[in-house]
Regions:
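N-terminal Rossmann NAD(P)H-binding glycine-rich loop of SDR-like oxidoreductase domains
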Residues: 5-19
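Rossmann-fold cofactor-recognition segment
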Residues: 31-47
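Conserved Rossmann-fold cofactor-binding substructure of NAD(P)-dependent oxidoreductases
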Residues: 42-60
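Conserved mid-core alpha-helix of short-chain dehydrogenase/reductase
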Residues: 46-49, 93-101
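Conserved NAD(P)H cofactor-binding loop of Rossmann-fold oxidoreductase domains
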Residues: 65-73
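Substrate-binding pocket helix/loop in short-chain dehydrogenase/reductase
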Residues: 75-76, 83-85
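Catalytic loop of short-chain dehydrogenase/reductase
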Residues: 86-90, 94-97, 109-137, 141-149, ...
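C-terminal helical subdomain
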Residues: 150-151, 155-203
Length: 203
């Protein structure tokens, strides 16, 4: 398959890239600071540019995979309206735009795989923006799946990565971590499988 991978230079994106490429897929990487295409999906015009340039390089895409989406982590009292808006733009609207524009750009039975996270169902202190964004992404996936068939859309919702415990483990006390390889396998399930409207929780 020809796959557009957003957020390819981060820890998760690199793991997803390695796994999908190892299975014989042709990957076009997108990142803000690296990759085949250097673009920011929080800007709808740059999403359009990503699709245009990907089509020039590879023709019709079979799948779009997102491993990107930043949200701020602060207590509610320390958050500003712009903090919440930035988190929503960065993780929700950017990924929605990938699907909204992408339905006319990918194969008729192609797929989208978005990124969400554990905080939508198991919130942590300072994580209200992430919980908001993740919940919105998951609700969008379930609803959009009804509209875009036979194209498919799913999300992957991991907990904290084993490889990131040193940096983030204190924010997730008692939460079982998940290896990046397991998360990448959930992306494979979405890309190569037949389900739609699902949120895969790697374990």
């Amino acid at each position: 398959m020809r796959i557009l991978l957003i957020g390819a230079t981060g820890k998760l994106g690199a793991a997803v890239h390695e796994t999908l490429a190892g299975r014989g897929h042709e990957i076009i990487t997108v990142g803000r600071r690296g990759g085949d295409l250097r673009l920011d999906i929080s800007d709808p015009a740059q999403v359009t540019e990503a699709y245009d340039r990907a089509a020039e390089r590879a023709g019709t895409l079979d799948a779009v995979v997102s491993a990107a989406g930043d949200t701020p982590y602060k207590p509610v009292a320390a958050m500003t309206a712009e903090d919440y808006a930035a988190g929503f733009r960065g993780k929700v609207l950017g990924q929605i735009e990938l699907v909204r524009q992408g339905t006319a750009r990918i194969a008729g039975r192609g797929s989208f795989t978005l990124i969400t996270g554990v905080s939508s169902r198991d919130p942590i202190p300072t994580g209200s923006a992430a919980a908001m964004a993740n919940g919105a992404v998951e609700a969008f996936v379930r609803a959009a799946a009804l509209d875009i068939a036979p194209q498919r859309v799913n999300a992957v919702g991991p907990t904290v990565f084993t490889e990131s415990l040193a940096e983030y483990g204190d924010f997730f006390p008692g939460v079982k971590p998940v290896d990046l390889a397991q998360v990448a396998a959930a992306y494979v399930r979405s890309v190569e499988g037949g389900q739609t409207g699902q949120v895969y929780e790697p374990v």
